[in-house]
């Protein structure tokens, strides 16, 4: 599924840049659109093979959660290394809660991270919030994320 998403992103990039598609990309689009138009599939997602189990997490949310969790793990590795997972979770919960209450309301409109955040804790916090996954995360859930 993630290979298909990657291929679709490349197709999108090529279309926006007015670059020609590869034969494989053209084939993927043609077959998928034909399946959708002929009503062989109930949605474009199904036609493209982007399926998730009934009641499961949609692919776009799963991707956002993976990005968020990676940013939170990187934050812990860079700035909380050597501390117990519970201490890391508490520190990150404080950072993200404060950020949510103060700065995120301004930063959410930005498409690029502020330069001042580079190399700081806020860099990883901004990435986690920008991922699109629910934030801030409670301490208990942070312990689960950081424990992996």
Positions of the model-derived regions?
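Low-complexity, PEST-like segments
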Residues: 1-110, 115-124, 130-147
